[in-house]
UniProtKB/Swiss-Prot annotation:
Annotated source species: Mus musculus
GO BP term, example: G2/M transition of mitotic cell cycle
Gene3D superfamilies: Phosphorylase Kinase, domain 1, Transferase(Phosphotransferase) domain 1
Protein name, per record: Serine/threonine-protein kinase greatwall
GO cellular component: centrosome; cleavage furrow; cytoplasm; nucleoplasm; nucleus
Family under the similarity heading: Belongs to the protein kinase superfamily. AGC Ser/Thr protein kinase family.
């Protein structure tokens, strides 16, 4: 019995597994699944082909991405896709799929075999009044539906009116349409779009169709290049981005395969780091105060614990380098306290054997640069700011020291790391250089500015290493500041010689004291120290490399606008809205602290386990007790600009408004305000609340209210480019005059179509477009006379639609009340018999499109996409 029941359970489990495995995952189809039957027509922005998939015919509109980019029409392709996806009207062409490849965009629509009205008009010459009324009535219903859903067609003409198998009219070609949704469409927009009542016709879409219609259209996909880094930049998990709390950068080093090199590098760095707790004293650039005086700034102190970051949009002098190494969640990004204690135990025994060494953890490395197992050294890239290049060199000996004979920033930052755990499969490329195939700006400006800054730095090189202990009153001292077990070190300042020196004091577990923390006027070595999870806490020694410091040193100013502000944050909780990620590759997303171990970039001294447990109890809280502050701090405190040596300190920085504005931390929320520019603007918003646990309570006592400027939107609001788009004969006067326009432009075009239906010629037709425009502005209409005279009702209806003043122009309500449309059954119009019903030879017949193609001298014979 037991064996029988067990067999039944096994059979049942197998059946369930088989059933589950058969469930297909919804996905958009590939364009390869469609077979091209023949070309249909060609327009200004693409070609239309007759395609087939699964026995069903489709009209496939193919648009080249390169053409759209060259014509600056990328947003119009998006608008056309959105307009067709949102429309569920029997008088609008139905869109099934929106697909794309590396070079093309494919809009898969229903195929209407009757051709377009322009071709039919060429055959008929002109329409009878009854036929014209029916066509105009159906187009009016389509326009009314579109306008109620915030869509303006803006290119209404007989060429864009297709005839269905039953002879009804359907609008197409929304390439110049305007969708007032002001955001990307989502699944709910497509699923809940109201549709006009039409029995026996279903407008529902399959999951694959919905996924294709809400996908983002990428116009900058490199053709013919399968760059794994570019793909991982957008599709891979953001572990590397979370490690740096940074943003996706346009530069990267090619990486063949993602390996576990990150975790091994981190572990080896921690081991070497523990044995080298000191970092060499480095003198930073000394002309900050002179530059600030020249620029008319007067910041005196720094109270902000959070610095805001953005890309330097003017010259990209401080690019954020992408960390190409993507580590998995199981690669050991989270370290427990036991691992920290082991690292700390090694540090006490290795201090005497290691010389003073500056460890530079390069943000760019290649997995092929790891030597074989048993090797004692790993060469990391050395960055030389004078040559602006990355190189990989073999070390001469095991213990590498800084070559102080080099001038400027051309100093070696090589290091030696024990890598006995690495495998032999990583032997390969060495001596690689930085590539620029993903860079959208020339590095000439960076080279020139770096040379200029190096010259200025050499002039002040003699003052390096100066230690100043005087208190200048420009800084505040805070004691007992705990950041999740990360103990900051003591900083001293000097203002007399305009020199800022970074000093570190070696701490031992036997002799620990409460350090004083002060803010640097221009701390190139200060980096963000992120909080780990409540269970995992970091207390090992780590240093920031010269590469990271040069790339992430910030420039924040409270009273002047500097381009290129970068952000370093310690523990301030950033609450940011998530903008559209298809444009925009930058985000302020919080990392997953349960699975992520962030390597701090600031020099930190080890804490005993007892001190760290005190921090683990509530890692989200930061307690700080301000000591006696200087007298200068009792007045209004401004935010001090932080400028790195590599940034453009002497450049004209007032040419672009700053994307960042900083307010007091006790009442600040950071919100993202997308202004249509790159990068997105970030502005704080006053909330009128008490400081959070992540903010310094010292600022609450100041009593000064830092108010955000009321004009929080940075940059100009998105507006039309002012170009006149459309066919000249059907353009409304407001489009020609460049004034604001709305749905009334479609009703003007409908009046032009009514005149053309009844006469065969547009009312403002002339020899040149300029003459056509003059006829439109003068409203010069050649009314037929004699036997060809139009009826009074038809002429009256055209007069209402062709009104110069768009506010007085007729709309749907006026047309329904007009005598010309008195006999139209508006509710059942789609069920009435039409005067022309197509009679094709077969289902693939495209002869009804030939009349228009011949009139425009189009030869449709090629299959090239």
């Amino acid at each position: 019995m037991e064996s029988a029941s067990a067999s039944e359970e096994n059979e049942g489990g197998a059946a369930i597994e088989e059933c589950v495995s058969r469930i297909p995952v919804p996905r958009p189809p590939s364009i390869e699944e469609f077979t091209i039957v023949k070309p249909i027509s060609r327009g200004a922005f693409g070609k239309v082909y007759l395609g087939q998939k699964g026995g069903k015919l489709y009209a496939v509109k193919v648009v080249k991405k390169a053409d759209m980019i060259n014509k600056n029409m990328t947003h119009q392709v998006q608008a056309e896709r959105d307009a067709l996806a949102l429309s569920k009207s029997p008088f609008v062409v139905h869109l099934y799929y929106s697909l794309q490849s590396a070079s093309n965009i494919y809009l898969i629509m229903e195929y209407l075999i009757g051709g377009d009205v322009k071709s039919l008009l060429h055959i008929y010459g002109y329409f009878d009044e009854e036929m014209a009324i029916k066509y105009i009535s159906e187009v009016a219903l389509a326009l009314d539906y579109l306008h109620r859903h915030g869509i303006i067609h803006r290119d209404l003409k007989p060429d864009n009116m297709l005839i269905s198998n039953e002879g009804h009219i359907k609008l197409t070609d929304f390439g110049l349409s305007k969708v007032t949704l002001n955001r990307d469409i989502n699944m709910m927009d497509i699923l809940t779009t109201p549709s006009m009542s039409k029995p026996k016709q279903d407008y529902s879409r399959t999951p694959g169709q919905v996924l294709s219609l809400i996908s983002s259209l990428g116009f900058f996909t490199p053709v013919g290049e399968k760059d794994q880094d570019s793909a991982n930049m957008f599709s891979a998990p953001k572990s590397a981005a979370q490690l740096s709390r940074g943003f996706i950068c346009p530069m990267s080093v090619d990486q063949k395969e993602p390996t576990s090199y990150s975790s091994k590098l981190l572990k080896s760095c921690f081991e070497t780091l523990s044995s080298n707790p000191e970092i060499p004293v480095k003198c930073l650039t000394s002309n900050l105060l002179q530059c600030r005086k020249r620029l008319g700034t007067s910041s005196t102190s720094s109270q902000s614990h959070t610095f805001v970051s953005s890309v330097e949009s003017e010259c990209h002098s401080n690019p954020k380098w992408e960390r190409d190494c993507q580590s998995t969640e199981s690669s050991g990004c989270a370290m427990s306290w036991n691992a920290v204690e082991m690292l700390y135990a090694k540090s006490t025994s290795a201090i005497k054997t290691k010389t003073e060494l500056e460890l530079a953890l390069s943000p760019i490395h290649d997995s092929s640069a790891i030597p074989a197992a048993g090797s004692n050294q790993v060469t990391l890239p050395r960055k030389c700011f004078r040559e602006i290049s990355w190189e990989a060199r073999d070390p001469d000996n095991e213990n590498m020291t800084i070559d102080k004979g080099q001038s400027g920033f051309c100093q070696s930052s090589q290091r030696s790391v024990n890598s006995s755990a690495t495998s032999e499969e990583h032997l390969g490329k060495r001596n690689y250089k930085r590539n620029f195939h993903l860079v959208d700006s020339s590095p000439c400006q960076e080279i020139m500015q770096s040379k200029k800054n190096c010259t200025e730095y050499e002039a002040n090189k003699e003052r390096q290493g100066c230690r100043a202990n005087q208190s200048t009153g420009l800084t505040t001292e805070v004691q007992n500041l705990k950041l999740s077990g990360c103990e900051s070190q003591q900083l001293d300042y000097a203002n007399k010689e305009n020199i800022v020196t970074y000093l570190t004091d070696r701490q031992t577990p036997e002799k620990l004291h409460i350090p004083t923390i002060a803010k640097n006027l221009m701390s190139e070595l200060d980096e963000d120290c992120e909080l780990s999870s409540k269970k995992d806490c970091l207390s090992s020694n780590s240093v920031c490399s010269d590469e990271d410091r040069a790339l992430k040193t910030t420039c924040v100013d409270s009273d002047s606008s500097f381009p290129g502000v970068s952000m370093m944050e310690s523990s301030l909780e950033i609450q940011a809205l998530e903008p559209d990620k298809s444009i925009r590759d930058y985000s302020f997303e919080e990392p997953n602290t349960e699975d992520l171990f962030v390597l701090p970039k600031c020099q930190e001294n080890s804490l005993p386990q007892d001190d760290c447990h005190a921090c683990i109890q509530d890692s989200s809280q930061v307690s700080a007790h301000p000591s006696k502050a200087p007298k200068a701090l009792t007045s209004k405190i401004n935010v001090v600009a932080f400028r790195s040596f590599n940034s453009h300190i002497n450049a004209s920085t007032n040419s672009e408004p700053s994307k960042i504005s900083i307010t007091s931390l006790d009442a600040m929320d950071i919100s993202c305000d997308y202004s249509g520019s790159y990068p997105m603007a970030v502005s704080p918003t006053e909330k009128g609340r008490h400081y959070t646990s992540h903010q310094t309570p010292n600022q609450v006592k100041l009593g000064t209210s830092y108010r955000t400027p009321k004009s929080v939107r940075r940059g100009a609001a998105p507006v039309d480019d002012g170009r006149i788009l459309g066919t000249p004969d059907y353009l409304a006067p407001e489009l020609l005059l460049g004034t604001a326009h709305g749905p009334a432009v479609d009703w003007w075009a409908l009046g032009v179509c009514l005149f053309e239906f009844l006469t065969g010629i547009p009312p403002f037709n002339d020899e040149t477009p300029q003459q056509v425009f003059q006829n439109i502005l003068k409203r010069d209409i050649p009314w037929p006379e004699g036997e060809e005279k139009l009826s009074d009702n038809a002429q009256s209806a055209m007069d209402m639609l062709l009104t110069i003043d768009d506010s007085k122009r007729a709309g749907m309500r006026e047309l329904k009340q007009h005598p010309l449309f008195s006999e139209v059954d508006w509710e059942n119009l789609q069920h009435q018999t039409m005067p022309f019903v197509p009679q094709p030879d077969d289902e693939t017949d495209t002869s009804y499109f030939e009349a228009r193609n011949n009139a425009q001298h189009l030869t449709i014979s090629g299959f090239s996409l």
